[in-house]
Amino acid sequence: MQIPTDKYGAGHTLDDGRHCVHFERHLPYPIETIWASLTDPAHLTKWFPGLVFEAKLGGKFEIWFSGECDGPAHVSGEVSAFEPPYVLQLGSIRWELSAHGEGCLLVFTDILYVDERGLEYVSNSVLGGWHKYLDSLERHLDGGAGDPRTDVEVDYSKL
């Protein structure tokens, strides 16, 4: 299945029938810089403070979301892919990095667990949340700071 490029993210149905949200971000930094921001606790505390994990295949991870989160406030599981500096997968959440021009292409996918609220509601909620976190990553890479759980307003009209 060909999934279109989308900075703001989009919901898709995979060939196996599962649903996901998908983002692609072109970042003007080398892969190693992005990888460090995804995996180094010193970086994570600045843009994704609710994430902790063992940086190895089979390691444990935990994510704590807060604020007005419509989904689960806590997610945990195993690191299901760890291929430095290209692939990090925490359960259903996957970051893939590849060289792109003088920078990096970050491809982000999260497989959805649809509940009684329905696919559209869950997809839109998850899209908005991950959009905030990916924007926070970009601000961190640009030298800024901020906790996406508390200080980011998403322009939902762009999603």
Per-region residue spans from a language model:
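Hydrophobic/basic alpha-helical segments enriched in Actinobacteria
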Residues: 18-23, 37-43, 65, 69-70, ...
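Hydrophobic-ligand binding "helix-grip"
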Residues: 49-56, 60-116
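Hydrophobic pocket/interface hotspot
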Residues: 34, 44, 61-63, 79, ...
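Hydrophobic ligand-binding cavity/cleft-lining segments
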Residues: 1-51
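Terminal "cap-and-tail" regions of soluble proteins that handle hydrophobic small molecules
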Residues: 1-14, 101-105, 111-159
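Glycine-rich, flexible loop segments associated with nucleotide phosphate handling
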Residues: 19-20, 72-77, 122-126
